[in-house]
């Protein structure tokens, strides 16, 4: 019996069983309802299955890129800290060297006449120059290791460090191959010597066997000794042969490995160069895009703003110039009117009447307007003469501008003749001389 039934009273047990049965029935119904696949869920699952490999590969590449960026930033920070420490160490060494080289007997620089310090002594200038040279030397010595490590970090980022390791492996394999070839030559010589010694011993044995019926006790001892030596020579020859075969196999294996390593290095360098070339190409495209963007920004935004600003400033300057010119002109007219009025007042004070103007009988004149302002007649006549002179000068200037515009706008022979005042013959001669000079200049340039 389960424990939970023992912990409950008997009146509660049927009710608990009914609740459990209803829960199981409800879960079975839900399972039966959920077990039927819906078409929308099926399409989503298929799409998820298709996109899952791409998402996983993209996620892996993103993680690798982030890891590489973090590693590169850590390396850069490490090298910057190392460079800063190297510079500080160089400064400490320089200060220590200066303290050691100082001489207390050669430090007098008091100017007793002016009660100040003497500056720019030759020794001080030389010390400053040497200080800069020594500082540069210390900096170069201290930064040499940093530059080396920075170059190594750059190779790690670009992937050339592996190629460097492969190149070192190839160098080591070449050295091993040379050593193996040298040992192989020695083993071949030893094998040749062993074969020669065995052949000689066999020749001696054969000679003894040919006169076997004529052996003496010395020949028997010689045969026994030669037979033992022949067994030793056979063993030495077999050992030399085995060593030679093993060395030849090793030499062949090293040659094959070296050949494969060289091919691998060539292939990896090609991939690395393609990667660098692709990176430089993308960098060039990015720089070109930035230049085009800057050009568009300058041409579409800055240039119109600059042109509008220049136009506004030019208009303001022209307005100010016209206002200044009108102000000066008004001042001149005011001065002139003041002088004329002073002269007329002086003449009236001395009792001198103004000279009457001669009347014109050819053309009837309109009656003069009444002097309501109380101005004398001489002032009005002077102002009228000044206005007429200004109008005449302005008309002459306007006619001169119109002649120039007409001559530029319609460059005909009659217009040029009327503008320059030359006869037609002179204009033709002038054109002929200009054409001849142009032809001569073109011939000289072409030859």
Swiss-Prot record:
Purpose: Required for the maintenance of the structure of the mitochondrial inner membrane. Involved in mitochondrial morphology. Causes growth arrest when highly overexpressed.
GO terms under biological process: inner mitochondrial membrane organization
Pfam families named among the record's database cross-references: She9_MDM33
Residues in compartment: Mitochondrial intermembrane: 303-381, 445-447
Record membrane topology: Multi-pass membrane protein
Keyword ATP-binding: no
Organism (species): Eremothecium gossypii (strain ATCC 10895 / CBS 109.51 / FGSC 9923 / NRRL Y-1056) (Yeast)
PANTHER family: SENSITIVE TO HIGH EXPRESSION PROTEIN 9, MITOCHONDRIAL
Location of this chain's protein in the cell: Mitochondrion inner membrane
Protein name: Sensitive to high expression protein 9 homolog, mitochondrial
Regions of this protein lying in the Mitochondrial matrix compartment: 403-423
Similarity section: Belongs to the SHE9 family.
Region forming the signal peptide: none
């Amino acid at each position: 019996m389960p424990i939970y039934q023992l912990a409950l009273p008997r009146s509660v047990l049927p009710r608990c069983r009914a609740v459990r049965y209803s829960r199981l029935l409800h879960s079975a119904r839900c399972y039966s309802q959920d077990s039927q696949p819906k078409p929308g869920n099926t399409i989503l699952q298929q799409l998820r299955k298709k996109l899952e490999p791409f998402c996983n590969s993209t996620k892996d590449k993103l993680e690798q890129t982030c890891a590489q960026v973090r590693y590169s930033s850590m390396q850069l920070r490490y090298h910057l800290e190392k460079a800063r420490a190297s510079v500080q160490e160089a400064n400490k060494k320089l200060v220590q060297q200066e303290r050691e080289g100082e001489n207390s007997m050669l430090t007098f620089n008091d100017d007793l006449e002016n009660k100040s310090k003497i500056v720019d002594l030759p020794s001080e200038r030389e010390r400053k120059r040497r200080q800069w040279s020594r500082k540069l030397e210390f900096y170069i010595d201290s930064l040499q290791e940093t530059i080396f490590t920075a170059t190594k970090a750059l190779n790690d980022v670009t992937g050339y460090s592996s190629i460097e390791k492969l190149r070192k492996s190839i160098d080591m394999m070449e050295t091993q191959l040379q050593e193996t070839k040298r040992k192989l030559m020695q083993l071949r010589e030893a094998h040749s010597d062993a074969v020669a010694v065995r052949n000689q011993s066999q020749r001696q044995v054969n000679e003894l066997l040919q006169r076997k019926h004529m052996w003496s006790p010395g020949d028997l001892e010689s045969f026994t000794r030669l037979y033992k030596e022949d067994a030793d020579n056979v063993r030495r020859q077999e050992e030399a042969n085995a060593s030679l075969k093993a060395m030849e196999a090793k030499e062949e294996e090293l040659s094959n490995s070296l050949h494969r390593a060289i091919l691998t290095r060539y292939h990896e360098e090609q991939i690395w160069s393609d990667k660098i070339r692709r990176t430089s190409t993308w960098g060039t495209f990015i720089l070109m895009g930035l230049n085009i963007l800057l050009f568009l920004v300058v041409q579409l935004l800055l240039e119109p703003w600059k042109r509008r600003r220049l136009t506004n400033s030019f208009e303001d300057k022209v307005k100010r110039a016209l206002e200044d010119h009108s102000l000066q002109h008004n001042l001149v007219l005011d001065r002139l009117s003041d002088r004329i009025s002073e002269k007329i007042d002086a003449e009236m004070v001395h009792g001198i009447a103004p000279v009457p103007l001669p009347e014109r009988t050819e053309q009837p004149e309109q009656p003069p307007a009444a002097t309501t302002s109380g101005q004398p007649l001489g002032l009005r006549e002077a102002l009228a003469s000044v206005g007429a002179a200004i109008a005449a000068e302005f008309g002459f200037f306007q006619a001169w501008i119109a002649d120039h515009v007409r001559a530029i706008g319609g460059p005909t022979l009659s217009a040029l003749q009327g503008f320059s005042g030359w006869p037609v013959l002179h204009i033709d001669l002038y054109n002929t001389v200009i054409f001849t000079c142009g032809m001569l200049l073109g011939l000289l340039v072409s030859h």
